[in-house]
C-alpha cells in the first residue's frame, strides 16, 4: 500500500544525547561537522571528561555515587548514577519530540546509563531511537558480554535501536586509515540518521512528509533500517535507491520490512518516472504488503543529483544473508544478534545533506573485490526479477 502525505510540515524538536565517553565523543564530532535544528546533550559520570564536551547541555550524573570519578567500567554503577540524577535528565529532555540516545556499549557509563536515559525519554513521550556501538573483538570477552547485556537493555527501552559493530569498521577503511578517521565512519551513522530525519521533517515538499509520518513508521518497532543514497547521471534514481537500502555497516536486511518511509529529493529535472523507479526498488525489497509512505522535495540546488532517504521497520530481526557489494551510503541498521557478522562491502560511507554538496570520492568495490556477475546484483534485486519471471510464465 502506497500512501501519499500532503499538508503542513510541522518542525519537531530533535535532541541528541551522548552518554558516556563514546557517546560524548560522537556528539563532539557531530557538533564539529555542523548541524542545524538539533540540540545536543552530554551525560557522563566522569566530570573531567564531561568538561571536554562541546554540547550546550552537560549533565554530570551520580555525583554522590561516583564523586565525578567515572563508573570504573561497571555498568551497574552507570545505571545507579543515572537513576540518582533522574530529575536533571528529565529537565534536559523536556520538550523533545524525538530523542537519539548514543553510547558505546561495553564500558560502565554508556552501558549502564544509556538504557535509563532512553527509558526516561520514552516515558516522557518522545520518539526514542538508540544508536550504539559494540566493542571490537580484541577488547575482550568481558567487554563483549557487558555490551550484549547493554544492547538488550537498550532494546527494551527505546522505540527503535541501531547497533554498529565496531569490527565492521575494519571492513570499510584502509589499513593506513588513522584511528580517529575510522571512528568518524561510525559517527556518520548517527549524524546521517539525525540529518536525514531532520531534513525530512524540516523541508516542505511537493508530496510532503512530517514528524507524524516518522513516528508512524518508527514507534515501538524494535528494529529500524535507515539510509541515504545519492546518485547523478544515468539511472540516478535506481542507483540512489539501491545505495539507501545497502550499507557496509548493516547487519539487518530491508527484506520483509512492513513499514517504509521514503523521501526523494531532486532538482527541477526530477521526473515522475524516476520517482516510480526508485520507489519500485524499495517496495520490491520490502514485504509485499508493506505500508509505504512516500514524499518528494524539489531542491534546485541539487541540479543533476537525486537524494533518496529510507526508513524501514517491522521486519524480522535476523542478520542479512546477502553480501552487500554495491557502494552504499546507508547510515545504520538495528540488529538483535550479539555476534559480529563480517560484511563483504568495502566502500566508505559518504556524507550527504539535502542542502549541501553531496559528492565525496570513494574507492569503488570493483577495484577492491572480485565477484561474479551475479554476485554484483543484490539478492533482493535478483529475487524481484525471479518473481516477475514467474508471474510472466503464468
UniProtKB/Swiss-Prot annotation:
CDD domains associated with the record: FtsZ_type1
Biased composition annotated in UniProt, kind: Basic and acidic residues: 365-388
Gene Ontology molecular-function annotations: GTP binding; GTPase activity
Chief location category: cytoplasm
Biased composition (Low complexity): 328-346, 353-364
Subcellular location: Cytoplasm
SUPFAM superfamilies, per the entry: Tubulin C-terminal domain-like (SSF55307), Tubulin nucleotide-binding domain-like (SSF52490)
Gene3D superfamilies: Tubulin/FtsZ, C-terminal domain, Tubulin/FtsZ, GTPase domain
Oligomer and partners: Homodimer. Polymerizes to form a dynamic ring structure in a strictly GTP-dependent manner. Interacts directly with several other division proteins.
NCBIfam families: ftsZ (TIGR00065)
Function: Essential cell division protein that forms a contractile ring structure (Z ring) at the future cell division site. The regulation of the ring assembly controls the timing and the location of cell division. One of the functions of the FtsZ ring is to recruit other cell division proteins to the septum to produce a new cell wall between the dividing cells. Binds GTP and shows GTPase activity.
Protein name in the entry: Cell division protein FtsZ
Lineage: Bacteria, Bacillati, Bacillota, Bacilli, Bacillales
Gene this chain is encoded by: ftsZ
Amino acid at each position: 500500500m502506497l500512501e501519499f502525505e500532503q499538508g503542513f510540515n510541522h518542525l519537531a524538536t530533535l535532541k541528541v544525547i551522548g552518554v558516556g565517553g563514546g557517546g560524548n565523543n560522537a556528539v563532539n564530532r557531530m557538533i564539529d561537522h555542523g548541524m542545524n535544528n538539533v540540540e545536543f546533550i552530554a551525560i557522563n559520570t566522569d566530570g573531567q571528561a564531561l568538561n571536554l564536551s562541546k554540547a550546550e547541555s552537560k549533565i554530570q550524573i551520580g555525583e554522590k555515587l561516583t564523586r565525578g570519578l567515572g563508573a570504573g567500567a561497571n555498568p551497574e554503577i552507570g545505571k545507579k548514577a543515572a537513576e540518582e540524577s533522574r530529575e536533571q535528565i528529565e529537565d534536559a529532555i523536556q520538550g523533545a519530540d524525538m530523542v537519539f540516545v548514543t553510547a558505546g556499549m561495553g564500558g560502565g557509563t554508556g552501558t549502564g546509563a544509556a538504557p535509563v536515559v532512553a527509558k526516561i525519554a520514552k516515558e516522557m513521550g518522545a520518539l526514542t531511537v538508540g544508536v550504539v556501538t559494540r566493542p571490537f573483538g580484541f577488547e575482550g570477552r568481558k567487554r563483549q558480554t557487558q555490551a550484549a547485556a547493554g544492547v538488550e537493555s537498550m532494546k527494551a527501552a527505546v522505540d527503535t535501536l541501531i547497533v554498529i559493530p565496531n569490527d565492521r569498521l575494519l571492513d570499510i577503511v584502509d589499513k593506513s586509515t588513522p584511528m580517529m578517521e575510522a571512528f568518524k565512519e561510525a559517527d556518520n551513522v548517527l549524524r546521517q540518521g539525525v540529518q536525514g530525519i531532520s531534513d525530512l521533517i524540516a523541508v516542505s515538499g511537493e508530496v510532503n512528509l512530517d514528524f507524524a509520518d516518522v513516528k508512524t513508521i518508527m514507534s515501538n518497532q524494535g528494529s529500524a533500517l535507515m539510509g541515504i543514497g545519492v546518485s547523478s547521471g544515468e539511472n540516478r534514481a535506481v542507483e540512489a535507491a539501491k545505495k539507501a537500502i545497502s550499507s557496509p555497516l548493516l547487519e539487518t536486511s530491508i527484506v520483509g520490512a512492513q513499514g517504509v518511509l521514503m523521501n526523494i529529493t531532486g532538482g527541477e529535472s526530477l521526473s515522475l518516472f524516476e520517482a516510480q523507479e526508485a520507489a519500485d526498488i524499495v517496495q520490491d525489497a520490502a514485504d509485499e504488503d508493506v505500508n509505504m509512505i512516500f514524499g518528494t522535495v524539489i531542491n534546485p540546488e541539487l541540479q543533476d543529483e537525486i537524494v533518496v532517504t529510507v526508513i524501514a521497520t517491522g521486519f524480522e530481526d535476523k542478520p542479512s544473508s546477502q553480501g552487500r557489494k554495491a557502494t552504499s551510503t546507508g547510515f545504520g541498521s538495528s540488529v538483535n544478534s550479539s555476534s559480529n557478522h563480517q560484511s563483504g562491502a568495502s566502500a566508505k560511507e559518504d556524507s550527504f545533506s539535502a542542502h549541501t554538496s553531496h559528492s565525496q570520492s570513494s574507492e569503488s568495490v570493483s577495484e577492491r573485490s572480485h565477484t561474479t556477475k551475479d554476485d554484483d546484483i543484490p539478492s533482493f534485486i535478483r529475487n524481484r526479477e525471479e518473481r516477475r519471471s514467474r508471474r510472466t510464465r503464468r
